[in-house]
Curated annotation (Swiss-Prot):
<keyword id="KW-0539">Nucleus</keyword>
<feature type="compositionally biased region" description="Polar residues">
    <location>
        <begin position="260"/>
        <end position="278"/>
    </location>
</feature>
<feature type="modified residue" description="Phosphothreonine">
    <location>
        <position position="111"/>
    </location>
</feature>
<dbReference type="GO" id="GO:0003700">
    <property type="term" value="F:DNA-binding transcription factor activity"/>
</dbReference>
<feature type="modified residue" description="Phosphoserine">
    <location>
        <position position="44"/>
    </location>
</feature>
<comment type="function">
    <text>Could participate in abscisic acid-regulated gene expression.</text>
</comment>
<dbReference type="GO" id="GO:0045893">
    <property type="term" value="P:positive regulation of DNA-templated transcription"/>
</dbReference>
<keyword id="KW-0010">Activator</keyword>
<feature type="compositionally biased region" description="Basic and acidic residues">
    <location>
        <begin position="354"/>
        <end position="370"/>
    </location>
</feature>
<dbReference type="InterPro" id="IPR046347">
    <property type="entry name" value="bZIP_sf"/>
</dbReference>
<keyword id="KW-0597">Phosphoprotein</keyword>
<protein>
    <recommendedName>
        <fullName>ABSCISIC ACID-INSENSITIVE 5-like protein 8</fullName>
    </recommendedName>
</protein>
<keyword id="KW-0805">Transcription regulation</keyword>
<dbReference type="GO" id="GO:0003677">
    <property type="term" value="F:DNA binding"/>
</dbReference>
<comment type="subunit">
    <text>DNA-binding heterodimer.</text>
</comment>
<feature type="compositionally biased region" description="Polar residues">
    <location>
        <begin position="62"/>
        <end position="77"/>
    </location>
</feature>
<keyword id="KW-0238">DNA-binding</keyword>
Length: 370
């Protein structure tokens, strides 16, 4: 219990930062305000439908600031808003002591209607781009329940601080603590994005962990498993000691906690704005191949239909010839019958008239009479 109050005091001591890029935007409205203005029930619609309604409201709302599109992961787009909020508020995490801590205890018992649209999308894991070139990750995300308090806490889905208060961490007001979900601590300057290290620059001093590993200021980016954040703030002279980093198990690129897969892919909040043409080439190749297959299939179907019509025409002609042949056979049989009957009638007695031959008369051709 003492560790919880110390964590709460540490959160309250961090500086407050308002999200200037979201002022005047519909994303700064609460869910109740959005439902009242549009007359909709957000809890019963899908995440895709909610994003579409927000986009249409931004187009029709006068004086509202356009914040760009919001991208949802495939596993999240078809889920219900109420189910997503329930999964967010009922997340559980088992700490090293074997206890179970409910995350709703740290979120101040917020309801879906009290939370802003921006904070809801952040907790759900949506990725979006605004007009300033940043991502939706730049907005405020609060654990204590205040939506305008920027804690600099990088929240992963279904994750919480593990064994945070096992070792007391000395606080310094000259630097800010960047807290990872695995329990590691590093110095962090607010509103600095995670970027690749340019040539000629190096990262600040890192923190000594309890397992003996130490990150120096000249450490390269080859070890991508460790989160390196540039910082210009001062660090206390003593090394900060924290519990060893215990990464959560992953399956197919998604973190799993307590045997359940998370809603999002790893690191959905970081958007560096880089684009790649490889995906476009692959899509164009797939499209060309699909068009070729469709054309071949249409040609095959056309040939089959033509062959079927030819067979049907030949079959009709054959049937007509067969019918005509049958008629001729019947006529021939009838003629034969008539001929036989006529012969029978001629052979019956009395039916044939016998004409007597006339008597032969001798005609004198020569005469002796003189």
């Amino acid at each position: 219990m003492d560790s919880y109050w110390r964590l709460k005091n540490l959160v309250n001591d961090l500086p407050v930062s308002t999200s200037l890029s979201r002022q005047g935007s519909i994303y700064s409205w609460t869910v109740d305000q959005f439902q009242t203005s549009l007359g909709l029930d957000c809890g019963s619609m899908n995440m895709d439908e909610l994003v579409k309604h927000i986009s249409s409201a931004e187009e029709t709302q006068e004086g509202s600031q356009r914040q760009g599109s919001t991208t949802l992961p495939p596993t999240l787009s078809k889920q219900n808003v109420g189910e997503v909020w329930k999964s967010i508020t009922e997340e559980k995490h088992t700490n090293n002591n074997g206890g179970v801590t409910n995350i709703t205890h740290l979120q101040g018992q917020q309801t879906l209607g009290e939370i802003t649209l921006e904070e809801f999308f952040i907790r759900a894991g949506a990725r979006g781009g605004n007009t300033n070139g940043g991502s939706i990750h730049d907005s405020s995300s609060s654990i204590s329940g205040n939506p305008h308090t920027s804690l600099g806490v990088q929240i992963q889905p279904k994750a919480m601080v593990s064994d945070f208060m096992n070792n007391m961490v000395p606080r310094s007001h000259d630097s800010y603590l960047h807290q990872n979900v695995n329990g590691s601590m590093s110095t962090y300057q607010p509103q600095q994005s995670i970027m690749s290290m340019p040539n000629g620059y190096s990262y600040g001093k890192q923190i000594r962990f309890s397992n003996g590993s130490l990150g120096s200021g000249n450490q390269s980016l080859q070890d991508t498993k460790r989160s390196l954040v540039p910082s210009v703030a001062t660090i206390p002279s003593e090394a900060i000691t924290c519990s060893p980093v215990t990464p959560f198990p992953t399956l197919n690129g998604k973190q799993k906690i307590n045997g359940e897969s998370s809603l999002l892919s790893p690191s959905p909040y970081i958007s560096n704005g880089s684009t790649s043409t490889r995906g476009g080439k692959i899509n164009s190749e797939i499209t060309a191949e699909k068009q070729f297959v469709d054309k071949k299939l249409r040609r095959k179907i056309k040939n089959r239909e033509s062959a079927a019509r030819s067979r049907a025409r030949k079959q009709a002609q054959t049937m007509e010839v067969e019918v005509e042949l049958e008629n001729l056979k019947k006529d021939y049989e009838e003629l034969l019958k008539q001929h036989v009957e006529l012969r029978k009638r001629q052979m019956e007695p009395g039916m044939i008239s016998l004409h007597e031959r006339p008597e032969r008369k001798l005609r004198r051709t020569k005469s002796d009479i003189k």
